[in-house]
């Protein structure tokens, strides 16, 4: 249960993955292996990849069940852009936002080698003026102008255009990411949140 959001049911399919998806995941696994083999997991200790098959099946379910208004996808904190690539393979116009320059570079190199076209923005997913503070139970979002603030804009992206946001937050950031989604997304947008150990859920703002 996430305050202010309504859960969207998921019915993940089973069976074989499409060849293009398997190829993408194999290439992504190689990048991830090299990354940790270089000892960079200690440098970027907050980067932990989600289970890509679980993510793929969840996005696929939202498409099959017609839960989405359109096919525009944004991965917040995209790391290697694995989810953005999966979304593109499912027919989305996809992008990712990542603050760490090295992760952006690796995601773009992976994308280009595999012939995909999703965009990777080397930016913060916090709009200008928004801040994160440590609250009693985790991180909280500070919104300029308070709850009645207008929907934010990025210089590089209009979040109101996004139909599906994806994020894998740390446990103490789940409520913060839900707060951010309530400001970024419009009433038709869906937030897909990976919650670790194969758990994933989808949410939409209450009407």
Each language-model region and where it sits:
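S-adenosyl-L-methionine
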Residues: 1-69, 108-159
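C-terminal substrate-binding/active-site "lid" region of AdoMet-derived donor-dependent transferases
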Residues: 164, 171-207
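Residues in the short beta-alpha loop(s) of Rossmann-like NAD(P)-binding domains
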Residues: 100, 110, 197
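Conserved class I S-adenosyl-L-methionine
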Residues: 69-79
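Conserved SAM-binding motif I beta-strand of class I
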Residues: 93-98
């Amino acid at each position: 249960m996430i305050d202010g959001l309504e859960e969207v049911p998921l019915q993940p399919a089973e069976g074989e993955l499409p060849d293009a998806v398997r190829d993408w995941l194999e290439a992504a696994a190689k990048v991830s292996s090299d990354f940790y083999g270089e000892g960079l997991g200690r440098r970027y200790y907050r980067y932990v990849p989600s289970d890509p098959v679980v993510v793929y099946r969840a996005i696929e379910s939202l498409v099959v069940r017609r839960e989405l208004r359109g096919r525009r996808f944004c991965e917040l904190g995209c790391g290697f852009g694995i989810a953005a690539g999966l979304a593109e393979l499912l027919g989305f116009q996809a992008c990712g936002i990542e603050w760490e320059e090295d992760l952006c570079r690796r995601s773009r190199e992976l994308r280009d080698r595999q012939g995909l076209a999703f965009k990777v923005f080397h930016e913060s997913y916090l709009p200008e003026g928004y801040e994160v503070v440590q609250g009693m139970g985790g991180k909280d979002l500070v919104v300029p102008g308070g709850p009645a603030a207008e929907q934010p804009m990025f210089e590089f992206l209009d979040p109101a255009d996004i139909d599906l946001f994806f994020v894998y937050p740390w446990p103490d950031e789940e409520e913060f990411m839900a707060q951010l989604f309530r400001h970024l997304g419009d009433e038709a947008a869906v937030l897909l949140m990976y919650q670790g150990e194969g758990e994933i859920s989808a949410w939409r703002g209450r009407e």
